[in-house]
């Protein structure tokens, strides 16, 4: 049976239609500000850049209302002032994650350090020249808080939490999950020095991450100690020389 020219044209038209109906994937770059610092996304995705940006801004607002110590109306600020003990999903997740790291580090990591952070002049508040640490230490200790249901129980109502050390990495994970839900398998998400990457970059190679040389005035110089080529990891590159 001969394959007519008419049928051939119909077949080619159908193939072109199928190809044209498939969403095109390409690398997009999205940049902006979240959590009081900068973010950058490079991803191979069908999502347009403006849609990704809108999603990120929505997450930023959600995080500020939940975990910000700078927004006096946030849920965390109200908990720290003793006005609420209710926890949302973001706070529960991060309290449990922080507790795990605290136990693994034998208390070297601790989210109850907010009174100490303020005493030494971080968190935007003027600190004391010689803080009275002995009076503050009774309010610090990850074993002095626990979750019961959806509520936070403190051994002392004056205990306060600070998620600045974990919040950026958590938001990186939220953005990465959003990209993956929309089919992206190749991306790099960074917020300040925290990041997560998967797959390959636009050239088909591993993602290249710059690690700054750790000295005091390198905030402006941005000298690099080395460039690491990585994939399928989460990481942080900023150290205590930033503070």
What are these regions (language model features)?
Residues 2-8, 15, 19-243:
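Mature catalytic core of soluble alpha/beta enzymes
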């Amino acid at each position: 049976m001969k394959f007519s020219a008419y049928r051939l044209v119909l077949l080619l038209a159908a193939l072109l239609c199928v190809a044209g109906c498939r969403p095109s994937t390409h690398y997009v770059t999205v940049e902006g500000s979240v959590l009081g610092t900068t973010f950058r996304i490079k991803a191979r995705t069908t999502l347009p850049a403006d849609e990704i940006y809108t999603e990120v801004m929505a997450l930023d607002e959600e995080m500020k209302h939940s975990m910000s110590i700078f927004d006096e109306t946030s849920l965390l600020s109200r908990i720290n002032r003793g006005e609420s003990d209710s926890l949302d999903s973001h706070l529960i997740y991060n309290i449990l994650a922080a507790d795990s790291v605290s136990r693994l580090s034998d208390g070297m990591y601790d989210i109850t350090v907010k009174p100490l952070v303020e005493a030494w002049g971080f968190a935007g508040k003027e600190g004391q020249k010689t803080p009275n640490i002995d009076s503050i230490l009774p309010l610090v200790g990850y074993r002095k808080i626990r979750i019961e249901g959806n509520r936070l129980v403190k051994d002392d109502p004056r205990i306060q939490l600070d998620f600045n050390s974990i919040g950026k990495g958590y938001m990186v994970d939220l953005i990465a999950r959003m990209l993956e839900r929309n089919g992206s398998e190749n991306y790099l998400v960074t917020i300040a020095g925290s990041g997560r990457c998967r797959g390959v970059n636009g050239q088909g190679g591993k993602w290249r991450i710059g690690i700054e040389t750790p000295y005091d005035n390198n905030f402006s110089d941005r000298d690099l100690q080395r460039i690491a080529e990585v994939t399928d990891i989460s990481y942080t590159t900023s150290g205590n020389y930033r503070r």
